[in-house]
Amino acid sequence: VAAGMFLGILFLFYEKTARSPLIETSLLFRNRTFAFSNLAALINYSATSAIVFLLSLYLQYIKHLGPRESGLIILTQPVLMALLSPITGRLSDHIEPRIVASAGMALCTTGLFILSGLQAETSVEWLLFALVVLGIGFALFSSPNTNAIMGSVSREYLGVASAMVGTMRLTGQMMSMGIAMLVLSVFIGKNPINPSNQEAFLHASRVLFLSFSALSLLGVFASLARGRNNTIK
């Protein structure tokens, strides 16, 4: 993960001097709204993308639920996001996206912090509550943040801005899973989850969710740091 971040920074500086860059780095170095909105997106995906992976393991190996029941529980978050995102997108047309997206990131932080207390005895209802908080947080963050990114560039750079959103999403997902696999390998190694190492798995999950909540908190400040969004026509 650290090597990937280092190489990513080197890549950005190389692109800055390249004759035909893959990424228009002037948008990152000169456009505050564009840069911090993308940073917030990267942090958000890095902090949240491993949730489904971790909770699916928890529900099946700790709660002993089947794949179908586990999937239906986890589905709470994306369904809420899908239902609310169109509303929050329109909301960000009337309220500054910085405020809406930052509130969403704060809710994601809260949801992750709730999950950091995961125990074998944690009720499914409490888990659903955390997923509801996360679902609302995702909805408040995602559409307004994308709105801020797309609105911060001129028409000629809309394709670049859209590609950057996708890049931040995929990079964040890879980082999130990389961190999760690293921590799990430290706590339980290559062993399958079984009664003898369930407590180690729970400990690893708590460490991960607490770390992700701290990362998400940094994302709140990154989101606020974008400043007022001056939409470019």
Task: List each model region and its residues.
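12-transmembrane solute porter fold
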Residues: L7, S20-K190, L202-R228
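Hydrophobic core of alpha-helical transmembrane segments in multi-pass integral membrane proteins
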Residues: V1-F13
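Short, charged juxtamembrane terminal tails flanking transmembrane helices
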Residues: N229-K233
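Interfacial non-cytosolic loop connecting adjacent transmembrane helices
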Residues: I193-Q198
